[in-house]
Amino acid sequence: MKSLSFLNHEFEAFPSPELALTDPNGLLAIGGDLRPERLLSAYYNGIFPWFNSDDPILWWSPDPRAVFIPGEIHISTSLRKYLKKQPWRITINHAFTDVMAGCAQPREKQSGTWITQEIQMAYRELHHTGHAHSIEVWEGERLIGGLYGLAIGQVFCGESMFHRKTNASKAAVAALQQHLLKMGFKLIDAQVMNPHLESLGAKAIKRIDFITLLSELRNNPLDPATWTTKEVILELE
């Protein structure tokens, strides 16, 4: 039976994602807080927060789930040619706070953002504890694009991306895929399907299948150097 849970500020286990509502799709719980242990518990169980600034905290686990398989993200021939011509520099974990701020800027035709100051503070704390990570794209000293997300074992949970120059966010995606492949990641959680994700090769899978994959991969160990600050050289051949 589908049901909506209400969380208080006491830390408690999340309900099973299978209890999430079908309308709105995936809404599982309301309330609680964004302390690191609660956020990590959420992602560990296939749940993520998403809410507007005037809403309570809303927790989601939609069905179906949008995912990428590292190595199967579509980087078109024209995009490869374009990126080869750019003098851009790409880094990992050089400017997490600035990437989040870039992602928080309202999109065209949008008046607000779900990446509130509360969200930014919570994920900065996860970054400081080694759980949240960023990819940055630079033109000279100017940050022109990037993305951020969480690593849960061999699963990367993508949260948001932004660009200030055409295709800069796609460069970040290409760099992320290349890095995850080298480091043995098996899955990228993209949460909710949309036309842009679909154009990049995202697949919609049943929630139960996503949770099964997550449970198989979330405890797998990684190279300790996986998320050290570094530069990425795109391999676009």
UniProtKB/Swiss-Prot annotation:
Its EC number is 2.3.2.6. Pfam families: Leu_Phe_trans. GO terms for molecular function: leucyl-tRNA--protein transferase activity. Keywords: Acyltransferase, Cytoplasm, Transferase. GO terms for biological process: protein catabolic process. The keyword Cytoplasm applies. Its main location: cytoplasm. It is found in: Cytoplasm. It catalyses: N-terminal L-lysyl-[protein] + L-leucyl-tRNA(Leu) = N-terminal L-leucyl-L-lysyl-[protein] + tRNA(Leu) + H(+); N-terminal L-arginyl-[protein] + L-leucyl-tRNA(Leu) = N-terminal L-leucyl-L-arginyl-[protein] + tRNA(Leu) + H(+); L-phenylalanyl-tRNA(Phe) + an N-terminal L-alpha-aminoacyl-[protein] = an N-terminal L-phenylalanyl-L-alpha-aminoacyl-[protein] + tRNA(Phe). Gene3D superfamilies: Leucyl/phenylalanyl-tRNA-protein transferase, C-terminal domain, Leucyl/phenylalanyl-tRNA-protein transferase, N-terminal domain. The keyword Secreted does not apply. One of its GO terms (cellular component) is cytoplasm. InterPro entries: Acyl_CoA_acyltransferase, Leu/Phe-tRNA_Trfase, Leu/Phe-tRNA_Trfase_C, Leu/Phe-tRNA_Trfase_N. Functions in the N-end rule pathway of protein degradation where it conjugates Leu, Phe and, less efficiently, Met from aminoacyl-tRNAs to the N-termini of proteins containing an N-terminal arginine or lysine. Belongs to the L/F-transferase family. This is Leucyl/phenylalanyl-tRNA--protein transferase. It comes from Shewanella baltica (strain OS195). The lineage of its organism: Bacteria, Pseudomonadati, Pseudomonadota, Gammaproteobacteria, Alteromonadales.
